[in-house]
Each structure stands twice: as C-alpha cells, then as structure tokens.
Curated annotation (Swiss-Prot):
Gene assigned in the entry: rplP
Statement: the UniProt record of this protein carries the keyword Ribonucleoprotein: yes
The organism of origin for this protein: Geotalea daltonii (strain DSM 22248 / JCM 15807 / FRC-32) (Geobacter daltonii)
Name by which UniProt lists this protein: Large ribosomal subunit protein uL16
Keywords: Ribonucleoprotein, Ribosomal protein, RNA-binding, rRNA-binding, tRNA-binding
Sequence similarity: Belongs to the universal ribosomal protein uL16 family.
Amino acid sequence: MLMPKKVKHRKQMKGRMSGTPQRGVSLAFGDYGLQATECGWLDSRQIEAARIAMNRYIKRGGKIWIRIFPDKPLTAKPAETRMGKGKGSPDSWVCVIKPGRILYEMEGVTEEVAREAFRLAAHKLPIPTKFTSRKDANEG
C-alpha cells in the first residue's frame, strides 16, 4: 500500500475539501487521463485496486502514472471502546481529492483501450470521474 515513509505529525485534523486544486489539473506525462469531477478521499487500497484493474486490462501494452499519493493519516479507535480517552491511533492513509484533479495517466495504447481501462478503474473509486486526453485539452 502507498504511505509516507516518515511524517512530521502522526495525526492530522479532518480538514475541509472546498475549492479547486492549484496543481495537478492538466496532463503532464501521458496522452490520456482520469480526472475527478467531485471532491472526496481516496484510500491507499482504492488507489491500488484501480491501478491493478487498469494493468490487468492493458496487460503489457502501455505505461500508467499514478498522479496522487495518500499523505493524510486517518485515525480509528478500537471496536467496542467507550467514547473519549483521546484520539485513536493512525489506521489508514488517504489522499484528499478536489474536482479537476488528474488521478491517473496512460500512454502507449489506443484511445478505446484507455477509455475501457479507465472505466474499469473508475468502478473501484468512490468519486465520480471523467476521461480526458491531450486532444481534448488542445481543443478546449
């Protein structure tokens, strides 16, 4: 699973997901991309599940870039524990996603293959996404 090697603070506040991202909204590496249309949290397991779904479909056909990284710790208290007694221990890692953020990029495959691979990956994610390409970015 994706997670930071070392962090300054073990626990973080929840925070808010308002606004649009400052960077990561345009294709940087590949020809096709999967772009988020709403905000949300992506768990490291969800990021990995989507990556595996894409890799299984394209086999050895192209290259995939993961443009997001889970750097926010989520805490959880043990089961059947009474309320209070402090914040729980770090349980998993999430990535804060804002609308417009590019999640994955791909190159070396046809557009039809990329569309289908991203469709399979989108089923593994809890946020709505859309397909983007360099061709669309140049026209718009």
